[in-house]
Amino acid sequence: MAKGQTLQDPFLNALRRERIPVSIYLVNGIKLQGQIESFDQFVVLLKNTVSQMVYKHAISTVVPARIPQNYLPQQAGEDMAEIED
């Protein structure tokens, strides 16, 4: 598995599990909103009034409405520990 997906998959999965609303910005500037219904190596299925299959190579940014509970990537956890000390 590529190193990039070790961060990407748990993040997307937490957003999916908790049904957190997200804004997905595409590389062409279009903003899509909805909830992540499913995802795989190449696509994200975004559900709003309709379901849209969005290719990951077209995604620039994923902005959740809130941070998933109990989600703290290992690197971010180390950074937070330094801040709290």
From Swiss-Prot:
Species this protein is from: Idiomarina loihiensis (strain ATCC BAA-735 / DSM 15497 / L2-TR)
PROSITE patterns found in the cross-reference section: SM
Assigned keywords, A-Z: RNA-binding, Stress response
Entry function: RNA chaperone that binds small regulatory RNA (sRNAs) and mRNAs to facilitate mRNA translational regulation in response to envelope stress, environmental stress and changes in metabolite concentrations. Also binds with high specificity to tRNAs.
Any one Gene Ontology cellular component term annotated for this protein: cytosol
Family the entry assigns: Belongs to the Hfq family.
Domain of life: Bacteria
An example molecular function term from Gene Ontology annotations: RNA binding
All residue ranges annotated as the Sm domain in the record: 9-68
One of the protein's GO biological processes: regulation of translation, ncRNA-mediated
Designated name of the protein: RNA-binding protein Hfq
InterPro entries: Hfq, LSM_dom_sf, Sm
Subunit-level organization: Homohexamer.
Keyword RNA-binding: yes
Gene: hfq
